[in-house]
Each structure stands twice: as structure tokens, then as C-alpha cells.
Amino acid sequence: ADVPGNYPLNTNGNMYYCTILGENEFCRKVCKVHGVKYGYCFNSHCWCEYLEAKDVSVWNAAKNYCKNPVGK
């Protein structure tokens, strides 16, 4: 079964590059920043399972999930 998801984008609007394919601690952390629990390295970029389009940009994800009230 294919799990939906997206490639998250960093502050420059680029995908997160990764070198260790599959299980990847860096990608898991990236995906948590974007508001989802799990992700891995696929085709040299981090992929996040269940990442919705509204949270693909790290700026949007930060606004949606950051607890810091600055800028709200």
C-alpha cells in the first residue's frame, strides 16, 4: 500500500538532501519539524509520510506548529 506524503522544503524552498537511503535520523527530524511523525531518505531527498501540502514549506510548518507566539 502506498502511503501518501510529500518532499518537505527547507527555508530556501529546496528539498532536503540526504545520503543514507531508507531509515535516516536527519529525515525523521526534518519530518517532525514539518509536523509529521515519520519520514525517510528516498532518491537522495527526505520524504515525509502523511505530510500535507500545507506543511511542505518549512515556513508554513513553523507557523502551524511552532509554539513561539512571535509573528502570529
Swiss-Prot record:
| InterPro entries tied to this protein | LCN-type_CS_alpha_beta_dom (IPR044062), Scorpion_toxin-like_sf (IPR036574), Scorpion_toxinL/defensin (IPR002061)
Q: In which tissues is it expressed?
A: Expressed by the venom gland.
Q: Which domain of life is it from?
A: Eukaryota
One Pfam family matching this protein: Toxin_3
Q: What is its main location?
A: secreted
Alphabetic keyword roster: Disulfide bond, Ion channel impairing toxin, Neurotoxin, Secreted, Toxin, Voltage-gated sodium channel impairing toxin
Q: Which GO terms describe its molecular function?
A: sodium channel inhibitor activity; toxin activity
Intracellular or extracellular location(s): Secreted
Q: Name one GO cellular component term.
A: extracellular region
S-S bonds: 18-41, 27-46, 31-48
Residue stretches making up the LCN-type CS-alpha/beta domain: 3-67
Role:
Binds to sodium channels (Nav) and affects the channel activation process.
Which comment does the entry carry about domains? Has the structural arrangement of an alpha-helix connected to antiparallel beta-sheets by disulfide bonds (CS-alpha/beta).
Family per UniProt? Belongs to the long (3 C-C) scorpion toxin superfamily. Sodium channel inhibitor family. Beta subfamily.
Q: What is this protein called?
A: Toxin Acra II-2
Species for this entry: Androctonus crassicauda
